[in-house]
Curated annotation (Swiss-Prot):
Residues of the active site: C86 (nucleophile), H194, E196
Source organism (scientific name): Caldanaerobacter subterraneus subsp. tengcongensis (strain DSM 15242 / JCM 11007 / NBRC 100824 / MB4)
E.C. number(s) listed in UniProt: 6.3.5.3, 3.5.1.2
Protein name per Swiss-Prot or TrEMBL: Phosphoribosylformylglycinamidine synthase subunit PurQ
Subcellular location per the Swiss-Prot or TrEMBL entry: Cytoplasm
Gene: purQ
PANTHER family the UniProt entry points to: PHOSPHORIBOSYLFORMYLGLYCINAMIDINE SYNTHASE SUBUNIT PURQ (PTHR47552:SF1)
GO function terms (MF aspect): ATP binding; glutaminase activity; phosphoribosylformylglycinamidine synthase activity
Pfam families: GATase_5
Annotated InterPro entries: Class_I_gatase-like, PRibForGlyAmidine_synth_PurQ
Annotated pathway: Purine metabolism; IMP biosynthesis via de novo pathway; 5-amino-1-(5-phospho-D-ribosyl)imidazole from N(2)-formyl-N(1)-(5-phospho-D-ribosyl)glycinamide: step 1/2
Keyword match Cytoplasm: yes
Subunit text: Part of the FGAM synthase complex composed of 1 PurL, 1 PurQ and 2 PurS subunits.
Domain of life: Bacteria
Keywords linked to the UniProt accession: ATP-binding, Cytoplasm, Glutamine amidotransferase, Hydrolase, Ligase, Nucleotide-binding, Purine biosynthesis
Length: 224
């Protein structure tokens, strides 16, 4: 299988994603510049963290108009696995591929530390190596990770089991401590924590492999 790591101007976690796939999973992976218009040869698409276009206007607001995003949308409609991490999550919400928005952290400060994450849904292609209620440790590094949805959308997320991860504690003001959500179809995941920074014991822990490894497992099984 082959992963695509999308590179926007201002991305800075693309290399982390690349080596997490190459060394952590042992799978094929390529960098894909944001001007690319065809992603059909890739099996999994990763939108990495960083500050695409300098986060001007707001995080992800300009990147959503990059040519590659139309290709991302097309592959999402086909059912391919897509994971947006941190800025990638912000881009997916701006593009309308995931519900909600990411606002400035409640304390208006950039937060960079390892935090406890609770698994809310273990039935997604990204979480089958995990158990509902399981606690894992993942790094976060964001200034705009405060996830917001209105009450109606929150009710829909709960009813459709689209909330995948929550912070164990209130880290940034996110509604109900939400750290990651998935689309209704179940193939597009957005999350603020960084699994690609937790794939080797030298980095502190390997909990990120639960998520990245689940993608491989479910691709082999045949998708969503």
């Amino acid at each position: 299988m082959k992963f695509a790591v999308i590179v926007f101007p201002g991305s800075n976690c693309d290399v982390d994603c690349y080596y997490a796939v190459k060394d952590g999973l042992g799978e094929g992976v390529e960098y894909v510049w944001h001007q690319e218009k065809n992603l059909s040869k890739y099996d999994v698409i990763m939108l990495p963290g960083g500050f695409s276009y300098g986060d001007y206007l707001r995080a992800g607001a300009i990147a959503r108009f990059s040519p590659v995003m139309e290709a991302v949308r097309e592959e999402a409609e086909k059912g391919k696995f897509i994971i947006g991490i941190c800025n990638g999550f912000q881009i997916l919400t701006e593009a309308g591929l995931l519900p909600g928005a990411l606002r400035k952290n409640e304390g208006l400060k950039f937060i960079c530390k390892t935090v406890s994450i609770i698994v809310e849904n273990d039935k997604t292609p990204f979480t089958t190596r995990l158990k509902k209620g399981q606690e894992i440790l993942l790094p976060i590094a964001h200034g705009e990770g405060n996830y917001y949805v209105d009450d109606k959308t929150l009710k829909e997320l709960k009813g459709n089991n689209q909330i995948v991860f929550r912070y164990k504690e209130n880290i940034n003001g996110s509604v109900e401590r939400i750290a990651g959500v998935i689309n209704k179809k179940g193939n597009v995941l957005g999350m603020m924590p960084h699994p690609e920074r937790a794939y080797d014991s030298l980095l502190g822990n390997t909990d990120g492999l639960y998520i990245l490894g689940s993608i491989v497992d479910n691709f082999v099984k045949g998708g969503v």
